[in-house]
Amino acid sequence: MRRFPPERIICLTEETVETLYLLGQQDRIVGVSGYAVRPPEVRKQKPRVSAFTSADIPKIMALEPDLVLTFSDLQADIVSDLIRKGVTVMAYNQRDIAGILAMIRHLGAVVGAADEAEKLASDYQARLAKMADANTHKPRPKVYFEEWDEPMISGIKWVSELVEIAGGCDVFPHLSVHKAATDRFVQSTDVIKAAPDVILASWCGKKVRSEKIAARAGWQDIPAVRLDRIYEIKSPLILQPGPAALTDGLDAIERALS
Protein backbone atom coordinates (compact mmCIF):
# COMPACT_ATOMS: atom_id res chain seq x y z
CA MET A 1 0.00 0.00 0.00
CA ARG A 2 1.49 3.31 -1.11
CA ARG A 3 -1.34 5.64 -0.06
CA PHE A 4 -2.80 6.05 3.40
CA PRO A 5 -5.63 6.23 4.07
CA PRO A 6 -6.18 3.87 1.13
CA GLU A 7 -7.98 5.56 -1.75
CA ARG A 8 -8.85 2.45 -3.77
CA ILE A 9 -10.39 -0.40 -1.78
CA ILE A 10 -11.80 -3.71 -2.96
CA CYS A 11 -14.18 -5.55 -0.63
CA LEU A 12 -14.49 -9.30 -1.15
CA THR A 13 -17.27 -9.70 1.44
CA GLU A 14 -20.51 -7.86 1.98
CA GLU A 15 -20.12 -6.53 5.50
CA THR A 16 -17.15 -4.27 4.75
CA VAL A 17 -19.03 -2.83 1.77
CA GLU A 18 -22.01 -1.91 3.93
CA THR A 19 -19.78 -0.54 6.67
CA LEU A 20 -17.92 1.78 4.30
CA TYR A 21 -21.19 3.07 2.86
CA LEU A 22 -22.54 3.73 6.35
CA LEU A 23 -19.36 5.64 7.17
CA GLY A 24 -19.75 7.78 4.05
CA GLN A 25 -16.59 6.27 2.56
CA GLN A 26 -18.13 4.52 -0.44
CA ASP A 27 -16.11 6.56 -2.94
CA ARG A 28 -13.04 4.60 -1.85
CA ILE A 29 -14.60 1.33 -3.03
CA VAL A 30 -13.55 0.30 -6.54
CA GLY A 31 -14.69 -3.34 -6.51
CA VAL A 32 -16.98 -5.65 -4.54
CA SER A 33 -18.10 -9.22 -4.05
CA GLY A 34 -20.83 -10.42 -6.36
CA TYR A 35 -22.91 -11.10 -3.26
CA ALA A 36 -22.90 -7.48 -2.11
CA VAL A 37 -26.49 -6.22 -2.01
CA ARG A 38 -26.43 -3.65 0.82
CA PRO A 39 -27.07 -0.87 0.19
CA PRO A 40 -29.09 -1.72 -2.96
CA GLU A 41 -27.29 0.88 -5.08
CA VAL A 42 -23.99 -0.97 -4.72
CA ARG A 43 -25.00 -3.40 -7.45
CA LYS A 44 -25.15 -0.55 -9.97
CA GLN A 45 -22.32 1.58 -8.62
CA LYS A 46 -19.47 -0.89 -8.12
CA PRO A 47 -17.92 -3.55 -10.36
CA ARG A 48 -18.14 -7.12 -9.10
CA VAL A 49 -14.83 -8.94 -8.89
CA SER A 50 -15.43 -12.10 -6.86
CA ALA A 51 -17.69 -14.77 -5.51
CA PHE A 52 -16.94 -15.84 -1.94
CA THR A 53 -14.17 -18.41 -2.37
CA SER A 54 -13.09 -17.40 -5.87
CA ALA A 55 -12.08 -14.12 -7.45
CA ASP A 56 -11.17 -12.61 -10.80
CA ILE A 57 -7.54 -11.82 -9.98
CA PRO A 58 -6.76 -10.08 -13.31
CA LYS A 59 -9.81 -7.84 -12.86
CA ILE A 60 -8.75 -7.00 -9.31
CA MET A 61 -5.24 -6.16 -10.46
CA ALA A 62 -6.58 -3.95 -13.26
CA LEU A 63 -8.44 -1.88 -10.65
CA GLU A 64 -5.11 -1.08 -8.95
CA PRO A 65 -6.32 -1.39 -5.34
CA ASP A 66 -4.42 0.13 -2.44
CA LEU A 67 -6.12 -2.39 -0.16
CA VAL A 68 -8.22 -5.53 -0.50
CA LEU A 69 -10.51 -6.50 2.38
CA THR A 70 -11.25 -10.19 2.91
CA PHE A 71 -12.79 -12.50 5.51
CA SER A 72 -11.47 -15.58 7.28
CA ASP A 73 -9.57 -18.65 6.16
CA LEU A 74 -12.29 -19.35 3.60
CA GLN A 75 -10.66 -16.74 1.36
CA ALA A 76 -7.10 -17.82 2.11
CA ASP A 77 -6.42 -18.95 -1.47
CA ILE A 78 -7.52 -15.57 -2.84
CA VAL A 79 -5.39 -13.80 -0.24
CA SER A 80 -2.38 -15.90 -1.15
CA ASP A 81 -2.73 -15.10 -4.85
CA LEU A 82 -3.03 -11.37 -4.16
CA ILE A 83 -0.09 -11.25 -1.76
CA ARG A 84 2.10 -12.97 -4.35
CA LYS A 85 1.20 -10.15 -6.72
CA GLY A 86 2.21 -7.52 -4.19
CA VAL A 87 -1.28 -6.42 -3.12
CA THR A 88 -1.88 -5.27 0.45
CA VAL A 89 -4.60 -7.46 1.96
CA MET A 90 -6.45 -7.18 5.25
CA ALA A 91 -8.37 -10.24 6.47
CA TYR A 92 -11.05 -9.78 9.11
CA ASN A 93 -12.13 -12.75 11.20
CA GLN A 94 -15.05 -11.59 13.35
CA ARG A 95 -17.31 -14.40 14.58
CA ASP A 96 -19.30 -12.73 17.36
CA ILE A 97 -20.94 -9.40 18.14
CA ALA A 98 -17.86 -8.02 19.87
CA GLY A 99 -15.84 -8.88 16.77
CA ILE A 100 -18.35 -7.16 14.48
CA LEU A 101 -18.18 -3.97 16.53
CA ALA A 102 -14.38 -4.13 16.56
CA MET A 103 -14.34 -4.58 12.78
CA ILE A 104 -16.45 -1.44 12.33
CA ARG A 105 -14.16 0.59 14.58
CA HIS A 106 -10.98 -0.78 12.98
CA LEU A 107 -12.14 -0.22 9.41
CA GLY A 108 -13.21 3.30 10.31
CA ALA A 109 -9.74 4.03 11.66
CA VAL A 110 -8.13 2.61 8.51
CA VAL A 111 -10.05 4.99 6.23
CA GLY A 112 -9.70 8.03 8.48
CA ALA A 113 -13.26 7.91 9.80
CA ALA A 114 -12.61 6.78 13.37
CA ASP A 115 -15.11 9.20 14.92
CA GLU A 116 -17.89 8.14 12.58
CA ALA A 117 -17.11 4.48 13.20
CA GLU A 118 -17.15 4.95 16.95
CA LYS A 119 -20.58 6.57 16.76
CA LEU A 120 -21.90 3.82 14.50
CA ALA A 121 -20.60 1.04 16.75
CA SER A 122 -21.81 2.78 19.91
CA ASP A 123 -25.27 3.25 18.42
CA TYR A 124 -25.40 -0.46 17.62
CA GLN A 125 -24.32 -1.34 21.14
CA ALA A 126 -27.05 0.84 22.60
CA ARG A 127 -29.63 -0.71 20.28
CA LEU A 128 -28.60 -4.24 21.24
CA ALA A 129 -28.68 -3.42 24.94
CA LYS A 130 -32.13 -1.84 24.65
CA MET A 131 -33.59 -4.88 22.91
CA ALA A 132 -31.94 -7.31 25.31
CA ASP A 133 -33.36 -5.37 28.25
CA ALA A 134 -36.84 -5.29 26.72
CA ASN A 135 -36.81 -9.08 26.36
CA THR A 136 -35.29 -9.90 29.75
CA HIS A 137 -38.49 -10.87 31.55
CA LYS A 138 -40.41 -12.37 28.64
CA PRO A 139 -40.85 -16.15 28.13
CA ARG A 140 -37.88 -17.44 26.12
CA PRO A 141 -38.77 -19.88 23.34
CA LYS A 142 -36.19 -22.52 22.50
CA VAL A 143 -34.71 -21.80 19.07
CA TYR A 144 -32.92 -23.99 16.55
CA PHE A 145 -31.12 -21.94 13.90
CA GLU A 146 -30.20 -23.91 10.77
CA GLU A 147 -27.43 -22.46 8.62
CA TRP A 148 -27.52 -25.30 6.08
CA ASP A 149 -29.74 -28.31 5.50
CA GLU A 150 -27.60 -31.09 4.01
CA PRO A 151 -25.77 -31.66 6.28
CA MET A 152 -27.60 -29.77 9.00
CA ILE A 153 -25.45 -26.98 10.46
CA SER A 154 -26.39 -24.94 13.53
CA GLY A 155 -25.82 -21.21 13.98
CA ILE A 156 -22.48 -19.48 14.50
CA LYS A 157 -21.71 -17.34 17.56
CA TRP A 158 -23.05 -13.97 16.39
CA VAL A 159 -26.32 -15.64 15.37
CA SER A 160 -26.59 -17.41 18.72
CA GLU A 161 -26.00 -14.11 20.51
CA LEU A 162 -28.63 -12.32 18.43
CA VAL A 163 -31.17 -15.06 19.15
CA GLU A 164 -30.61 -14.47 22.87
CA ILE A 165 -30.89 -10.68 22.51
CA ALA A 166 -34.13 -11.09 20.53
CA GLY A 167 -35.63 -13.07 23.40
CA GLY A 168 -34.91 -16.66 22.41
CA CYS A 169 -32.79 -19.46 23.81
CA ASP A 170 -30.39 -21.13 21.38
CA VAL A 171 -30.64 -24.90 21.76
CA PHE A 172 -27.05 -25.45 20.61
CA PRO A 173 -25.03 -22.63 22.22
CA HIS A 174 -22.09 -24.96 22.84
CA LEU A 175 -21.70 -25.48 19.10
CA SER A 176 -21.92 -21.79 18.20
CA VAL A 177 -18.43 -21.12 19.56
CA HIS A 178 -16.92 -23.19 16.73
CA LYS A 179 -15.81 -21.06 13.78
CA ALA A 180 -15.81 -23.86 11.22
CA ALA A 181 -19.16 -25.03 9.90
CA THR A 182 -17.89 -28.61 9.99
CA ASP A 183 -17.71 -28.32 13.78
CA ARG A 184 -21.36 -27.27 13.98
CA PHE A 185 -22.93 -30.28 12.29
CA VAL A 186 -26.03 -31.58 14.08
CA GLN A 187 -27.93 -34.82 13.70
CA SER A 188 -31.68 -35.02 13.23
CA THR A 189 -31.95 -36.80 16.57
CA ASP A 190 -30.17 -33.89 18.27
CA VAL A 191 -32.85 -31.47 17.11
CA ILE A 192 -35.66 -33.84 18.05
CA LYS A 193 -34.21 -34.15 21.54
CA ALA A 194 -33.77 -30.37 21.84
CA ALA A 195 -37.47 -29.86 20.97
CA PRO A 196 -37.22 -26.25 19.75
CA ASP A 197 -40.29 -24.03 19.92
CA VAL A 198 -39.10 -22.08 16.87
CA ILE A 199 -36.94 -23.08 13.91
CA LEU A 200 -35.11 -20.32 12.05
CA ALA A 201 -33.39 -21.23 8.80
CA SER A 202 -30.99 -19.39 6.53
CA TRP A 203 -29.43 -21.69 3.99
CA CYS A 204 -26.51 -19.58 2.77
CA GLY A 205 -28.44 -18.05 -0.11
CA LYS A 206 -30.45 -21.15 -1.03
CA LYS A 207 -34.23 -20.77 -0.65
CA VAL A 208 -35.47 -22.31 2.57
CA ARG A 209 -38.23 -24.88 2.13
CA SER A 210 -40.23 -25.01 5.35
CA GLU A 211 -42.25 -27.98 4.16
CA LYS A 212 -39.04 -29.95 3.64
CA ILE A 213 -37.95 -29.20 7.20
CA ALA A 214 -41.35 -30.18 8.60
CA ALA A 215 -41.33 -33.46 6.66
CA ARG A 216 -38.09 -34.75 8.17
CA ALA A 217 -38.48 -38.15 9.79
CA GLY A 218 -39.44 -37.90 13.44
CA TRP A 219 -39.85 -34.13 13.41
CA GLN A 220 -43.64 -34.07 13.48
CA ASP A 221 -43.70 -33.85 17.28
CA ILE A 222 -41.16 -31.02 17.55
CA PRO A 223 -43.11 -28.03 18.91
CA ALA A 224 -41.88 -25.71 16.14
CA VAL A 225 -43.13 -28.14 13.49
CA ARG A 226 -46.38 -28.98 15.23
CA LEU A 227 -47.23 -25.29 15.69
CA ASP A 228 -45.94 -24.24 12.24
CA ARG A 229 -43.24 -21.96 13.61
CA ILE A 230 -40.58 -22.44 10.94
CA TYR A 231 -39.26 -19.17 9.53
CA GLU A 232 -36.70 -18.18 6.92
CA ILE A 233 -34.25 -15.40 7.75
CA LYS A 234 -32.76 -14.13 4.50
CA SER A 235 -29.03 -14.85 4.30
CA PRO A 236 -27.91 -11.28 3.50
CA LEU A 237 -29.58 -10.16 6.73
CA ILE A 238 -28.04 -12.63 9.15
CA LEU A 239 -25.10 -14.59 7.74
CA GLN A 240 -22.85 -11.58 7.10
CA PRO A 241 -21.05 -10.55 10.31
CA GLY A 242 -21.63 -6.84 9.98
CA PRO A 243 -24.23 -4.07 10.22
CA ALA A 244 -27.01 -6.07 8.52
CA ALA A 245 -26.99 -8.75 11.21
CA LEU A 246 -27.12 -6.17 14.02
CA THR A 247 -30.09 -4.36 12.49
CA ASP A 248 -32.41 -6.01 9.99
CA GLY A 249 -31.24 -9.51 10.88
CA LEU A 250 -31.89 -9.00 14.57
CA ASP A 251 -35.28 -7.43 13.84
CA ALA A 252 -36.25 -10.41 11.67
CA ILE A 253 -35.36 -12.80 14.49
CA GLU A 254 -37.35 -10.80 17.03
CA ARG A 255 -40.41 -10.78 14.74
CA ALA A 256 -40.19 -14.54 14.32
CA LEU A 257 -40.02 -15.07 18.07
CA SER A 258 -42.86 -12.70 18.96
State the predicted function of each range.
Residues M1-S258:
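N-terminal ligand-binding lobe of clamshell/alpha-beta domains
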